Amino acid sequence: MFKLLSVTSRTLCKEDFLARVGTICAAGIDGIILREKDLSEPEYQSLAINVLQICREKGTPCALHTYVTAAKSLHAEALHLPLHAFLALGEKEKRAFPTIGVSCHSLVDVVAAQEGGCSYVTLGHIFATDCKKGLPGRGLAFLSEVCRHASVPVYAIGGINRDNIARVRDAGVSGACIMSGLMTCRDPAEYLEELRHAL
């Protein structure tokens, strides 16, 4: 089943961020990655307590991002890391999390993450996006090539919308990560329905 994941960016959100997370969960998103890297670890942990509670109430899987100590203290089941941080994790730390995702930007990255024992990877950015201003997307041929060699689920990220999501799916990914669209849209339920209808 093709999954849709929400990668958060509270600075893009015009309404109360926690309310938006709740709305996205209620709309049936397949998972949330709480990516708020500008926060200090104590600030992130404080936010994560509330987000994890919302996700648990809605039955939505939630991965905490970057801050390993906070994730361990909150008994998070899923952790998402940049590749360099994942490779620096000890085996005992890895075992603390049933699911660990890794952000990758090349086939070499994906191979390294796989060899390190990750659960899944995100791969991007696939299309040009305001989140990576001035940088061209890596494209669908790149995505297809990586998917052919990957032995773990690959989730595409970067500029994915209803106009291109079917082509992303056809490249062989397990799902897509949506950031700005779900943070800024008027109605997350309607937005997700449009994405699923396009598949």
Locations of the language-model features?
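Active-site mouth loops of central-metabolism enzymes
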Residues: 1-18, 98-104
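Glycine-rich phosphate-binding active-site loops on the catalytic face of alpha/beta enzymes
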Residues: 6, 83-93, 122-134, 162-198
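Active-site beta-loop-alpha junctions enriched in small/polar residues
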Residues: 7-11, 37, 67, 84, ...
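Alpha/beta enzyme core
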Residues: 16-31, 74, 84, 107-124, ...
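A short beta-strand-loop structural module common to alpha/beta enzyme folds
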Residues: 30-39
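Conserved beta-strand positions in the central sheet of alpha/beta enzyme cores
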Residues: 33, 63, 80, 101, ...
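Catalytic cores of alpha/beta
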Residues: 62-77, 105-117, 149-156, 160-178, ...
